[in-house]
């Protein structure tokens, strides 16, 4: 929050684009943008440059946070948006904000996501706090059912933590919503940045 406030004066309602693989910093920047009053824009980093250029042009971000990896159009991205391009971990030397107050209305824009573009040019989907969290109830019910299953089908001395292993990218709504639902219930959320590492990651979890 502190970093974003310094990087974007009067941040309320301003767009912050996230262009990165799944990582810890993705979650930090998503929460930070929302708490600072900005709008999170999740982008598919593996789209072609014409597709990305079109989407970035639509949202007109004040800042683009990215992982620095070249997915095929790094040179074009730097040439076009170098002045507002920053690393995903730019916040690391900032002090925690101690004066956070919620100034966002339930129907104010909070997240912008894009469709896949499989049926024509991708479209921006505008999500307010209210409609973004409409699926939260269903997610919590699902988690509760998993806990019930654990207690009725597994030995009580098997102290497993209810967890969700996400292999979808965080620009996908199905995974992005998990950032907000699972941790706040005390459940573990494991993010994979590459499906090819699935079995390695599962082994590391045990």
Tell me the role of every PLM-derived stretch.
Residues 2-47, 166-167:
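Conserved AMP-binding/adenylate-forming
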Residues 16, 33, 64, 109, ...:
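Conserved S/T- and glycine-rich ATP-binding loop of Class I adenylate-forming
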Residues 96-114, 120-121, 126, 131, ...:
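Conserved pre-ATP/AMP-binding loop-to-beta segment of ANL
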Residues 30-36, 58, 172, 180-184:
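Short hydrophobic alpha-helices that are characteristic scaffold elements of the AMP-binding
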Residues 133-163, 170-206:
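Conserved AMP-binding/adenylation subdomain of ANL enzymes
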Residues 20-21, 38-56, 68-71, 187-205:
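ATP-dependent adenylate-forming carboxylate-activation enzymes
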Residues 58-62, 81, 204-206:
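Active-site charged/polar residues at nucleotide-handling catalytic sites that mediate phosphoryl
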Residues 14, 50, 62, 107, ...:
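Structural detector for helix-capping/boundary residues
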């Amino acid at each position: 929050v502190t970093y974003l406030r310094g990087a974007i004066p009067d941040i309320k309602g301003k767009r912050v684009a996230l262009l990165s693989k799944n990582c810890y910093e993705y979650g930090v920047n998503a929460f930070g943008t929302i708490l600072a009053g900005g709008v999170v824009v999740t982008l598919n980093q593996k789209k072609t440059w014409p597709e990305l250029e079109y989407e970035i042009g639509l949202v007109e971000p004040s800042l683009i946070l990215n992982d620095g990896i070249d997915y095929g159009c790094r040179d074009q991205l730097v040439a076009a948006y170098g002045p507002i391009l920053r690393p995903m971990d730019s916040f690391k030397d900032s002090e925690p904000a101690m004066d956070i107050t919620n100034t966002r209305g339930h129907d104010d824009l909070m997240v912008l996501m894009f469709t896949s573009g499989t049926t024509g040019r991708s479209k921006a989907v505008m999500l307010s706090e209210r409609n973004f969290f409409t699926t939260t109830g269903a997610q919590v019910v699902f988690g509760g059912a998993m806990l019930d299953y654990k207690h009725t089908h597994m030995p009580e001395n098997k102290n497993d933590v209810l967890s969700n292993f996400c292999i979808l990218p965080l620009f996908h709504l199905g995974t992005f919503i998990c950032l907000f639902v699972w941790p706040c219930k005390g459940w573990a959320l494991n993010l994979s940045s590459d499906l090819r590492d699935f079995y390695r990651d599962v082994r590391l979890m045990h």
